Regions:
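Conserved non-cysteine loop/helix-boundary elements of the Radical SAM core domain that shape
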Residues: 94-225
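Local cysteine-cluster metal-coordination motifs and their immediate loop/turn environment
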Residues: 79-94
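N-terminal [4Fe-4S]-dependent radical SAM core
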Residues: 3-76
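Structural motif
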Residues: 73-75, 87, 169
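Residues at the beta-strand->loop junction immediately N-terminal to the Walker
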Residues: 77-79, 133-134
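Short, amphipathic alpha-helical segments
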Residues: 30, 81, 214-218
Length: 225
């Protein structure tokens, strides 16, 4: 409403005209919302509740990202292809860290070189988000995690206020609670991570065992605590 009021002021509208403008805008937004919900129902046979939820989430996301300049802004994704164990349902490129631990250092060293190259190639654009996924990034040691995050901080100049202020998200996936340690949390805090993602998949211990997750529901609660 504040945004619409500013638009009205710029257009020289009086209070009545501005109110009518806001009403028309709201009606148009609701019309688009309803059309999208109906599309979900007609094409994908989605329930009303799920169609409404998906559309509302998309609208909220749009409000968050509409300020991003797609020509001059960019987001960085960093993949860490290691996990504590491989889940039975997983289709991602991922390797059990227990077997491939000796490869992790080589991977991180090589990744750091690639990050330096990417930073150089995109130094004319604005970095707005960093997402470190996998795999399970927190399956590597806290020492290697520190090497990675320090490199990101250095080559992308995250300590510079103008860069840090433009960063809307710095996420590290910590999808497996059995991979989270106080040392790793301290490293993430030190290097400016603003969000971690802990994904239990299920809180049913029997299901966790069946799908190959080497942790239980109690560990999930402990990780959040």
């Amino acid at each position: 409403l504040e945004y619409l009021a500013e638009q009205a002021d710029e257009a020289g509208m009086n209070g009545h005209d501005a109110e009518e403008h806001a009403d028309r805008t709201h009606e148009k937004q609701q019309e688009i919302h309803d059309r999208i919900v109906q599309y979900y129902r007609d094409i994908y046979d989605t329930s009303v509740q799920k169609a409404e939820l998906a559309t509302t989430v998309a609208e909220n996301e749009h409000r968050l990202v509409k300020g991003i300049d797609l020509d001059n802004d960019y987001c960085l994704y960093v993949g860490i292809p290691f996990c504590p164990s491989r889940c039975l349902y997983c289709s991602f490129t991922s390797y059990p860290i227990g077997i491939y631990a000796e490869k992790a250092k080589t991977y991180i060293d090589t990744l750091c070189k690639e990050l330096a190259y990417v930073a150089e190639q995109y130094n004319h654009k604005r970095l707005v988000a960093i997402y470190i996924g996998g795999g399970t990034p927190t399956s590597i040691s806290h020492e290697l995690l520190a090497v990675l995050l320090k490199q990101i901080q250095t080559v992308f100049r995250l300590q510079e206020p103008e860069v840090a202020d433009g960063l809307v998200e710095f996420t590290v996936e910590a999808g497996r609670p059995d991979s989270i340690t106080p040392e790793k949390l301290a490293v993430m805090k030190e290097y400016g991570v603003t969000r971690i993602s802990i994904n239990p998949q299920t809180m049913n211990d029997e299901t966790l065992r069946t799908i190959g997750r080497a942790h239980n529901a109690a560990q999930v609660k402990e990780a959040f605590a």
